[in-house]
Each structure stands twice: as C-alpha cells, then as structure tokens.
Amino acid sequence: MKGRPFYQNVKRESGRKVQTGNINAAKTIADVIRTCLGPRAMMKMLLDPTGGIVMTNDGNAILREIQVQHPAAKSMIEISRTQDEEVGDGTTSVIILAGEMLAVAEQFLEQQMHPTVIISAYRRALEDMLDTLKEISTPVDTSDRSMMLKIVHSAINTKALSRWSELACNIALDAVRTVELEESGRKEIDIKKYAKVEKVPGGIIEDSCVLRGVMINKDVTHPRMRRMIKNPRIVLLDCSLEYKKGESQTDIEISKEEDFARILQMEEEYIQQICEDIIRLKPDLLFTEKGISGTCHLQCLKQNNTNITAIRRVRKTDNNRIARACGARIVSRTDELREEDVGVGAGLFEVKKIGDEYFTFITECKDPKACTILLRGASKEILAEVERNLQDAMQVCRNVLLDPFLLPGGGAVEMAVSKHLTERSRALTGVEQWPYRAVAQALEVIPRTLIQNCGASTIRVLTSLRAKHTQDNSVCWGVDGESGCLSDMAALGIWEPLAVKAQTYKTAVETAILLLRIDDIVSGHKKKDKEEQMGGQGAE
C-alpha cells in the first residue's frame, strides 16, 4: 500500500514505449486515408452508429465517423477537423504528412536522440518551409474567371464530383462571388452563414444551380395568400404575431362575465395594433421567426384590401440570408417598423412544389449578398457527397480571393521545398541537421502517395522527379495524378492556394511536435465499489 501512489486500476505508461505507441497510432490513422489522395482516390464506405451509410473520399468526413481509443489517434483526427474549419481543403494531405513526420522521427528516438533536439530541428524546418512557399508562390488575378475556374477544378478533380467538374466549378465560383462583401478595405466572405446548400432528392445533378437569392422549405400560412409576387416589398420580423401569453405564474381573477369579454377584446385590440403597424408600410411579404395567430391572418387578408403573404417560423439563419439578399432589416417589435426597414431588392417571390414539399423562392435580387445552392441528385448519399465536395470547392475560392497567391499542385511544391531544405541542411552543424533533413524526406510522401494511387512505379517516377527538380526552373514539375507520369503543373493548370498549403505544413509539423513531447500517458480512474455505495446509503 505504501509504495503505490495511484489507484489500482490507473494505468501508467512512460518513456520510449509511449513515444513508439504515439507514432504507431499516428501512422495507422495516416494509412487509413492514404488511398484517398489525388484524382485516382479510392472511396470509403462507413456505417455510422444509427445504421446510415457514408460514402466519401474526404479525409475529414472519414475520420469523423471512425471511433478510436488511442489519445494520439484522437489528436490526429482533431487536426483534420481543424484543417477543414480553417481552410476547407487539404484534410487528407495534413494527416498523411503528420504521420510521415512522426515516422521519420522514430529512427532518431531509437538512436537515443532527445525529443527536444528533434522538436527544435522541426521548428526551424517549418520556418524555412513557410519562407520557401512564399518565394515560389505566384500572384493570381482574381478577376480572371478562367484562371479561378482552373484553381477550383484542381480542388474538385480529386472528388466524386469530378464528372461534373465544369458545373461544380461555376456553381462554387458564382456562390463565393455573390457572398463576397468589401467593407472599409477589408474583404469578408462568410460561406457558412450566407451560402446555404439545399439538397432536394430527385432530378439529375445537371439540374443543380445557384439562385440569386434565397430558397427556404416553407409554404404560405393561408390558402388565400398570393403565391407569386413580382418586386415584393418584404418585412422581416423577429417577434410573435400572437397575443402575448402570460408567464407560468400569471393569475387573472374574473368575477363577472364582462371581465372575460374585456380580456378577449384586449387580446383582439393588441393583435389589431400589431397588424396596423405592419399594414402601415404596405408590404407584400412578411417573414417572422415566431408564430402568427388566426386573427392576424384575417387582418392581413381583409383590411383595406391588403393581401399580405405571411410565412411563419422561419429559421434565424434563413431570416439573416433573406435580409442580406433583399436589403431588409430584421425588426424585433412591430411598433419600431420604419420605411427603411422594408426590403425592395428582390425581383420575384414564388412558392413551388418540388417532389412532395413546397419551397419558397425569393430570387432575381438586384445585389444579393447571400445565395442558395440548389442541389438535385438521385439519392441522399450522393447529395451528401456532392455537398461535401462543393463546400471544399467554395473554400478554395474563398482562400484565393482572400490571399491571391498560388502554388503548383501534384506534389511539385513538396519536391521544391524538400530540395530547398536539403540544401539548407548542409549549412547546419551538430546533431540537429539530421532531423532537419528528415523533414525534407518526409515531404516526399505526398508525390509518392500520388504515384502509388495511380498504380505507377513509385521508385522510377520519384527518382525521375528528384532528378528533374535539380534542374533550373523546374519548380512546377510534379506528378500527374491521372496517369502517374511527370508533368508541368502550370501547363496542366493544376494549382493550389498558398493559404491551404501553408496551413497544411503548420498543422502537420505542430502535431508531430506535440506528439513527440508526450512521454507519459496516465489512463483510468477510480471506480466506486458497490459496498462503498451501499455503506454510504446506510450511513445516511
């Protein structure tokens, strides 16, 4: 008892065993999605706990569905999610690269090299990698549509959507251009909030399009309301158009019949006042995030021959998008409504039936800063994969518009950076030069994986690529992901945004450093014995 500081079921691992375990866990995760890189990527079919099927080759989507036990493996899955949230692309590359960074560190740990020395070399290598990326990057004219389409095509080409790449590229670029907002010299592109993807099963993928406006899965609240309005005046509310219900502790004492009639009259007067506030502005269309009472419906339809079309219980996010699309302002109280709060930017409002459901369209907006991407397809699984691919494509567009610098794809950048690091390692002295040089070796995993996924000869093609990069002006030479041959990426038009590549390198190296610093894992916790619990109950 004296010699045991931990509880009996607490397990502690330390030293070399932990570091080897972490490296093996990271390598295993990297091996799972290694075949998902490049245009010849294989797809994975995953069964989720509810029995649903996920078919994808998106690194983040695969790892999100996998249940892991090892803490290092959990860290690897987390970096894929971070990459997806930060830049939206490169989720597979970052895992493969992080796994390789740890794999090359294993030999130095076996040679009794201290992890701090390896980490110091990795940090220095990361700084040099980022400097090299800036040196070899080329600026891009974001107003050149054909160039932008080429960049998006490079991102989509590795996905299931590659068959419809032209359509997908145009959809992604149009959507991002629509939500682009420039205020006081600063660009803001919020895809998550203002570019909504609506998946409607049925039809074919070629029917998909970008709507210059908003589409929501709602119908009008009364059959007599208009279902098509040209140039509508739109009012957006964030308040209920029903009589205000009392709180849970509200009591009303009624002593005679007239009191009850008076209460009902007060309710009606309150709703009458709300309706008058709205009707005063002569809107055609009313959206509210809360409910609408029956009395209010009748007022909207009857008074002064008005026929206001009302749609209730609209989501907050949808209301925000409608506001951006038509220029309206969301108001929290009807008595605060002013003429400038009315949106007049929309050209057409209509309700359409697609399949079994009704959808409301607000389109032909003059200057929409929000849009809806309508996706059609054979099944829910296909639509889910198409949406994932489109999100990646839109993120690539966003990255290029915010940071207009490009790098050649197809492993060309990795080979160029690897060559620079190898040259710089010769100037280093001491033990640090070996881990520094190992980073250069690790970078070659990207072109090597591309070659493997094509089924080409890895040794022959990689040796030729190394030889090619020793020549001048060979930065753009990489692996053609379709055939596995050497090609000039600039000629093929395969480009990657600088923001994605820089984030991939930062995340991969930082993760390798994080896992190398771990030398102790303490797992388990004290479980209460049943006797203790029973004793505790008895004592009470």
Q: For the regions a protein language model found, what residue spans apply to each?
A:
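Residue-level signature of catalytic and energy-coupling elements of molecular machines
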Residues: 38, 88, 112, 172, ...
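Short hydrophobic alpha-helical segments that form membrane-spanning helices or hydrophobic packing faces
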Residues: 45-48, 94-98, 322, 415-420, ...
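Alpha-helical transmembrane segments of multi-pass membrane proteins, especially transporters
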Residues: 91, 95-96, 116-123, 433-441, ...
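Extended, low-charge hydrophobic alpha-helical regions
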Residues: 20, 67-69, 370-540
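Hydrophobic, well-structured modules enriched for small/aliphatic residues and gly/pro motifs
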Residues: 85, 89-92, 107, 111-125, ...
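Extended amphipathic alpha-helical scaffolds
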Residues: 1-61, 65-67, 122-385, 469-472, ...
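A short glycine/serine-rich beta->alpha loop
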Residues: 13-16, 60-66, 80-90, 116, ...
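A helix-coil-helix interface module used to build multimeric assemblies
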Residues: 48-82, 89, 102-104
